[in-house]
Amino acid sequence: MRKDNLRRTVVAAALAGVVAGSVGTGAAAAQDLAGKTVEFVIPFAESGGSAAWANFFAPLLSKHLAGNPTVVVRYRPGAGSTEGANWFQEQKTADGTLIFGTSGSTQFPYLLDDPRVRYEYKDWKVVLSSGTGGVVYLPPDLGERFDGDFDDLKDENYLYGSQGATTLDLVPLLAFKLLGLQVDPVFGIEGRGDGRLMFERGEANIDYQTTSAYLKSVVPLVEQKLAVPAFSYGALDADGNIVRDPTFPDLPSFKEVCEATEGCETSGVGWDAWKAFFVSGFAAQKLIYLPGGASQEVVDMYTKAFEDMIAQPEFAKNSEETLGVYPQGVGKAAMAAHEQAITVTPEAKQYVLDWLKEDYGITMQ
């Protein structure tokens, strides 16, 4: 499904555009990490999409960073990823041996003024952005009744394993609300991989995974007829419209399913809020940062490493197989994604805050 030539052309064009828009680094390789170990920290458990993403990039960074250091992925899960982000905020390592990978689950508490947040994105130095997608799926007994809308599935009671309503799970939970589904989230899991395990054990009957985790761990379930995909969240086209995710062109986007489901509206403040957090959580979802104290020389070294990596002929194919069909941004493109990820309109923010209070009793104080 993911091997068609058209989408390979899209990937190549997207990657070419990203590289063309990046900041030129010139001879930035005066910095050298020979003999050193780079810790690539992600604030999640090792079973989810962020782990797959980090483990894809770690060996490539080792190959392309000056001095070919060892790059090791470290996991610091807790408090919906805010614990790891708070830890990173306090780090003073400035020599390039520490990088941090965030996700929408880290961006959302920041956007919503979560009191657990003691980190400031504007203090950090972004060196890569990765867009991604997500797929919602059902067990076979419900999946066989799904025909492009949820009209016949609204009377079902759903259980969903969630990291928390202010994490990246905000996007599916708000989508479920707009669709009119009765979904009871089981809060407290450490990563989306734990949500998938709940689904596999029959403890949850609706789930979603980001693209990398879906390709790795859910596609085998689909092939064994143990799971049925319902929709992807979609992707943004050049004009900012939601279209089908190029990694899953055969799946309807959430917008299509919403339009087909009675009572679900694709206009108004509810839709605007969902789209705003979808953009922050998926179109600009994953970002790699250096601590704020890193020098421009270190930033340039990482930018050059990612530019060289993306320019390799095999990168598009390998990244498609592991991460899906999404551009990787460096330089100016990474900065633009960083701005998208940490920006939300007051109206969308207030809608989400009101919804969190009314449906889950969550207030940001």
Feature names for model-found ranges:
Residues 218-310, 347, 355-365:
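C-terminal lobe and pocket-closing loops
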Residues 234-241, 254, 311, 315-340:
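Mature extracytoplasmic/periplasmic domains
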Residues 17-28:
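C-terminal segment of classical bacterial N-terminal signal peptides
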Residues 31-38, 63-68, 87-98, 110-203, ...:
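Hinge/capping helix and adjacent helix->loop/strand transition within the periplasmic-binding protein
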Residues 40-57, 78-80, 161-167:
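Extracytoplasmic "Venus flytrap"
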